[in-house]
Each structure stands twice: as structure tokens, then as C-alpha cells.
């Protein structure tokens, strides 16, 4: 009888030891979800036109007050002359290089207002600083245009928000620059 109890205790001990060893290996194994891609990573990159559409909707922008230049709509693309006019600066000595631009959408006022939004996507994020220089030229030109007769609009242009994130770069001349930028950042991240 003592022998059978001893054998039972020994078997029980070995079973418990073996079971603990198996659990230790399971806990050390990598989890299957470690190499998965999240839904956000699978979604297609947002277009500049989609970003501007969201801004127009969210901030109730009256699009009748603006010309829209959208890369995805061939009839509304910027031509070389318009690019030079918009971004070369007040003295037109700069020849803007938009060769890294793969997408854009702009709202440019048709009224006497400085309000303007431009969002660009680049194939090389290192070109963002150069693009920001062109946007600064645009803001300075708009500020000087309005300075003699509309100080509020001139100030709006002087306070332009010019920024970038990843391959997107933008400028915003509105009364709600930071709110619009938050919308842009929400959409591109």
C-alpha cells in the first residue's frame, strides 16, 4: 500500500512538473498578433482633395467664394504660369520647382479676401522645406497686396500657418488656422 501511494505521489509530482514546463514554453512563445497590420495601416492614403472636402464640410466654407485647383481633376490643375504667379514671390524672381508634387488641392479666393488653403503631397518629404519657402512667398505677397486697404486681411496672410507632416505640406490663411490644421493632421495620420 505504501508503495502504491509513493508511486501515485511521484506520478502526480511529475505530471505537475511537466505541466508547468509546458506552460512556461507557451508563455514565452510570441503572440500571433505581433506581426499583424492594423486597419489604419491598411487604409489608402488620403488625397488632398478629400482633405479639402472635409475642411469645406466641417467649417462650412462657401465654395462659391473660391476657385478650387485640384490635381485629381485635370481641368482644374495648376499650369506653370499660375504656379509661378502664386509662389514665386513679389518680385517673381523665384522659379518654383513643383516636380516633387504628386497631389494637391487649393482653395484660392475669387473675392477680396486673403483666406486661402493649399495642401500638397510630395513624393519626397525632404522637399517640404523648399515648398514651405514658396508658401511663405505666397503669404507675403498676399499680405502686401492687402496692406494698403485692408489690414485685417493683410494680418490673416501675415499669420499664415505653414507646416508639414510626412509627405504632406500645407499653408492656411484663415481665421481658424489651428482648427483646420487639426483636421488635416487627423486625416493624414
What are these regions (language model features)?
Residues 1-6:
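Positively charged n-region of N-terminal signal peptides that target proteins for export
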Residues 21-116, 122-189:
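Soluble, non-membrane globular domain cores that form compact, hydrophobic packing
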Amino acid at each position: 500500500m505504501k508503495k502504491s501511494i509513493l508511486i501515485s505521489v511521484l506520478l502526480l509530482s511529475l505530471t505537475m512538473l511537466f505541466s508547468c514546463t509546458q506552460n512556461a514554453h507557451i508563455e514565452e512563445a510570441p503572440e500571433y498578433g505581433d506581426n499583424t497590420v492594423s486597419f489604419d495601416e491598411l487604409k489608402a492614403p488620403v488625397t488632398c482633395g478629400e482633405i479639402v472636402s472635409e475642411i469645406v464640410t466641417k467649417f462650412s466654407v462657401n465654395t462659391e467664394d473660391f476657385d478650387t485647383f485640384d490635381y485629381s481633376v485635370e481641368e482644374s490643375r495648376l499650369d506653370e504660369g499660375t504656379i509661378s504667379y502664386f509662389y514665386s514671390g513679389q518680385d517673381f524672381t523665384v522659379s518654383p520647382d513643383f516636380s516633387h508634387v504628386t497631389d494637391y488641392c487649393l482653395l484660392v479666393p475669387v473675392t477680396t479676401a486673403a483666406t486661402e488653403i493649399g495642401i500638397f503631397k510630395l513624393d519626397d518629404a525632404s522637399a517640404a522645406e523648399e515648398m514651405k519657402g514658396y508658401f511663405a512667398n505666397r503669404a507675403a505677397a498676399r499680405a502686401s497686396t492687402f496692406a494698403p486697404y485692408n489690414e485685417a486681411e493683410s494680418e490673416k496672410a501675415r499669420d499664415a500657418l505653414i507646416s508639414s507632416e510626412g509627405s504632406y505640406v500645407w499653408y492656411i490663411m484663415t481665421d481658424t488656422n489651428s482648427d483646420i490644421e487639426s483636421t488635416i493632421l487627423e486625416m493624414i495620420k
